[in-house]
Design a protein with these regions (language model features):
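Active-site groove signature of glycoside hydrolases
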Residues: 6-27
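Beta/alpha (TIM)-barrel catalytic core signal, keyed to glycine-rich beta->alpha loops juxtaposed to Asp/Glu
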Residues: 20-142
Length: 142
């Protein structure tokens, strides 16, 4: 719960309250919009966010009567360009991820991929991860 998170972090507020992979049917009621707005008014969250794969995100974009979320995080790859769902719906690429795993499957140089990603999502945040220390050092140089 948010209260436990705030307590554990010894904070009064989090910047982004992110829901990961929720089902649209569970969040499509007005109560969620009211709940999130109240958290903002109480100063407990600054922004609300939604992290989904592109297929599930479409339900939220097409069916939501109110703007439930300020920030959208969606998987993306250079070959499939899943995040184009945002662009087609006049929404910015804010937080994208999944590039390196898709590049690894295809045997593509990850540094070259990262340079292209920075062009694709030049105003948002790009999440990359690796448990290889050398890759992390290289990624930090791009």
């Amino acid at each position: 719960s948010l209260e436990n998170t705030l307590k554990n972090l010894k904070r009064d507020r989090v910047d982004i309250y992110m829901l990961h992979e929720p089902m649209y049917q569970l969040l499509s009621c007005n109560e969620w919009a009211i709940f999130l707005e109240n958290l903002k008014k109480e100063g407990k969250i600054r922004y609300s966010g939604l992290a989904l794969d592109a297929n599930n995100l479409l339900d939220f974009i097409k069916n939501s009567k109110t703007k439930l979320f300020d920030i959208l995080q969606v998987n993306d790859s250079l070959d499939q360009q899943e995040a184009n769902i945002l662009i087609r719906n006049q929404l910015p690429l804010q937080i994208t991820y999944g590039y390196l795993s898709s590049a690894k499957k295809r045997g593509v140089d990850f540094l070259n991929i990262l340079k292209k990603i920075k062009i694709r999502n030049n105003n948002g945040a790009i999440i990359v991860s690796s448990n290889n220390y050398e890759h992390i050092k290289e990624l930090s140089q791009v």
